[in-house]
UniProtKB/Swiss-Prot annotation:
It comes from Macaca nigra (Celebes black macaque). It comes from the Eukaryota. Pfam families: 7tm_1. Keywords: Cell membrane, G-protein coupled receptor, Glycoprotein, Lipoprotein, Membrane, Palmitate, Receptor, Transducer, Transmembrane, Transmembrane helix. SMART domains: 7TM_GPCR_Srsx (SM01381). PROSITE patterns: G_PROTEIN_RECEP_F1_1, G_PROTEIN_RECEP_F1_2. Residues 1-37, 94-118, 184-191, 267-279 are extracellular. A lipid is attached at residue 315 (S-palmitoyl cysteine). This is Melanocyte-stimulating hormone receptor. Belongs to the G-protein coupled receptor 1 family.
Length: 317
């Protein structure tokens, strides 16, 4: 994925450049200041991407296989897994093609490589935007299920969920296409950062409200029978805790990426910012790690999904 015209790793491979910096690697700091740069080997990118790819394929397969998981919430989870799958797949594809070009094992014209780079950029950006949107959709779905429990099934219906999913994918593709077309405009980068922050604020507000309700629930039923207390407390706390974990992981894994975009706008030539830019390999690795962690959370915290995953694995053998 690119943010500046010189940051075209695939095209750079045609010129047999020795640099091993993938994707968004910026120019080296020209001031001579010492910078901490974390080197991420291409093999690690491929390994992380492969693990994420397998995990997310299993999640999507399990949800598609089990009709009990065809609820709106699991539809959003399935789409989030699909977004993670696209993130991993696009990074694996770019890394693999780059290695082949650098080794001379793949011959391609510059125009073909540029088109491939554009496609990979659109896929990566689309999956990023859709991940944000689906995390927000999951948060809203859980919020409605807790605060409007009696009306939940009339508010969040499967047809509405499908329309929301379709709208998210269409909007993500259109916005990512515009982003790639106008990547050199600061306003485009700022829009992405603002969107990221807005979604984080929205989800954080919902999570805090849900946690507050869960705490009130626990206090109100503390004097009741233990089984009743666990039944009431488990529904609110488990859902809120799951979403809070998801938000925290997403922020830690994606935060550096959006910090990178912000600094490109605010201080593209500053020595300190240049040092941060040189660690974009690490930021990409964190994004792929997020795609690895998400399926683990779903599999271990959902008994129905975990059971279906076991059936899928047993059938594959």
């Amino acid at each position: 994925m690119r943010v500046q015209g010189s940051q075209r790793r695939l095209l750079g491979s045609l010129n047999s450049t020795p640099t091993a910096t993938p994707h968004l690697g910026l120019a080296a700091n020209q001031t001579g200041a010492r910078c901490l740069e974390v080197s991420i080997p291409d093999g690690l990118f491929l390994s992380l991407g492969l693990v994420s790819l397998v995990e997310n394929v299993l999640v999507v397969t399990a949800i598609a296989k089990n009709r009990n998981l065809h609820s709106p919430m699991y539809c959003f989870i399935c789409c989030l897994a699909l977004s993670d799958l696209l993130v991993s797949g696009s990074n694996m594809l770019e890394t693999a093609v780059t290695l082949l070009l650098e080794a001379g094992a793949l011959a391609a014209r510059a125009a073909v490589v540029q088109q491939l780079d554009n496609v990979i950029d659109v896929i990566t950006c689309s999956s990023m935007l859709s991940s944000l949107c689906f995390l927000g959709a999951i948060a809203v779905d859980r919020y409605i299920s807790i605060f409007y429990a009696l009306r939940y099934h009339s508010i969040v219906t499967l047809p509405r969920a499908r329309r929301a999913i379709a709208a998210i994918w269409v909007a993500s593709v259109l916005c990512s296409t515009l982003f790639i077309a106008y990547y050199d405009h600061a306003a485009v980068l700022l829009c992405l950062v603002v969107f990221f922050l807005a979604m984080l604020v929205l989800m954080a507000v919902l999570y805090v409200h849900m946690l507050a309700r869960a705490c009130q629930h626990a206090q109100g039923i503390a004097r009741l029978h233990k089984r009743q207390r666990l039944a009431h407390q488990g529904f609110g706390l488990k859902g809120a805790a799951t979403l809070t974990i998801l938000l925290g992981i997403f922020f830690l894994c994606w935060g550096p990426f959006f910090l990178h975009l912000t600094l490109i706008v605010l201080c593209p030539q500053h020595p300190t910012c240049s040092c941060i830019f040189k660690n974009f390999n690490l930021f990409l690795a964190l994004i792929i790690c997020n795609a690895i962690i998400d399926p683990l959370i779903y599999a271990f915290r959902s008994q129905e999904l975990r059971r279906t995953l076991k059936e899928v694995l047993l059938c594959s053998w």
